[in-house]
């Protein structure tokens, strides 16, 4: 009886044991078919600690592939805004998303079901990151409203995506010879600060390396679609460092400068020509008009240079302002010439009267020299063959001067002729200058810039 009871208990134990093994096998098979893993029971915190925490053995101070091939970091930027191009300081301001991607095999995982993990920005201190900086940066700031504008994403294969939002003020050396019809090329250089090319290499993303927000406009420039991508590897005493760059081509719009500089100065020049139609006797009016236009043109020229740097070469706007000032000043000098010529008849008559007076004095002196009336000889010097010979002056008296009104009319006509010629010569000369000016800067030099 006891042996029979033992056999029954043994059979029941074997049955339950077999059932338990079957259940475990079934659960494993079911989990494998459903994509679940036994480690799913790990909490996210435990998983991250195991992946990059203290228990993982991950060291953020050591780059991937340590003492091996360099880490290839792929970069691309998305431009949110582009503006504040300043000529005086020669820089520009831009707001971008900077995205860097690299592979860190130490962060590869297979225990977690998700293909990628979006981590909190605070985890950035726990992983290795490239030491990227902007070589031509003059000022920059991060954004933390309402939270840090940073993104960290890790894929199963160990690929890391690091995105950050930045506002940068970058240096942009400008050539202002054609200002304000110029095309500027501004660069953005991304360089490694610590790691040489033996450890780190930057590359542009093959698909869409530089993206621009839709509808992005600049107040004074047109941002051209073509952007030059290239390498700018730097050689220092400390080694050779990786560097990539993008060049933005900015074409200046002339609308503002036409309204503020070109059209006002053109009108001032035309206003100075009104003097040619004012009577030459109206000296106060013509002088006041000439001086006013000269001073206004000088102020306009100074204002055009106020917002520009002090460069050693001549700009297109400088040539325009200088020629306009020259035309205005020439119009003032033209009236000085007209006034001088119109008053020359007075000087001419004054010289005639002086010459006549001098001639009379000479005649009187000459007559008194040969007058012997005190000795009863009168005007007779000698008698030859019964004929008395009178003393005659050596130089005959000059012809009587022309009528004063005729002389005045002659000089006034000359002055009027100067005004008449100026009415046509000044506009014609200014028109010729405009033709050469606009052809040179809008066509010839513009094409040269595009060829470069």
From Swiss-Prot:
Reaction equation(s) it catalyzes: chloride(in) = chloride(out)
Q: Name one GO molecular function term.
A: transmitter-gated monoatomic ion channel activity involved in regulation of postsynaptic membrane potential
Q: Which Pfam families match?
A: Neur_chan_LBD (PF02931), Neur_chan_memb (PF02932)
Which keywords are on file for this protein?
Cell membrane, Cell projection, Chloride, Chloride channel, Disulfide bond, Glycoprotein, Ion channel, Ion transport, Ligand-gated ion channel, Membrane, Metal-binding, Postsynaptic cell membrane, Receptor, Signal, Synapse, Transmembrane, Transmembrane helix, Transport, Zinc
Where on this chain does glycine 2 bind?
A: 99, 163
- Signal peptide (UniProt feature, chain positions): 1-27
Which regions face the Extracellular side of the membrane? Answer: 28-256, 305-315, 442-452
Q: Which GO terms describe its biological process?
A: cellular response to amino acid stimulus; cellular response to ethanol; cellular response to zinc ion; chloride transmembrane transport; modulation of chemical synaptic transmission; monoatomic ion transmembrane transport; neuropeptide signaling pathway; spinal cord development
UniProt: Zn(2+) binding residues: 226, 228, 249
Q: Name one GO cellular component term.
A: glycinergic synapse
Q: Where is this site: Important for obstruction of the ion pore in the closed conformation?
A: 295
Site (Important for glycine and strychnine binding): residue numbering on this chain: 194
* Cytoplasmic face of the membrane: 279-283, 337-420
Q: Where does strychnine bind?
A: 99
Q: Where are the transmembrane segments?
A: 257-278, 284-304, 316-336, 421-441
Topology term for the membrane: Multi-pass membrane protein
Disulfide-bonded cysteine pairs: these are 172-186, 232-243
Indicate which residues are glycosylated according to the record. Answer: 72, 103
Role: Subunit of heteromeric glycine-gated chloride channels. Plays a role in synaptic plasticity. Contributes to the generation of inhibitory postsynaptic currents, and is involved in the down-regulation of neuronal excitability. Plays a role in cellular responses to ethanol.
Which family does the record claim for this protein? Belongs to the ligand-gated ion channel (TC 1.A.9) family. Glycine receptor (TC 1.A.9.3) subfamily. GLRA2 sub-subfamily.
Give the free-text miscellaneous remark of the entry: The alpha subunit binds strychnine.
How is this protein named in the record?
Answer: Glycine receptor subunit alpha-2
Q: What is the lineage of its organism?
A: Eukaryota, Metazoa, Chordata, Craniata, Vertebrata
The record's gene field reads Glra2
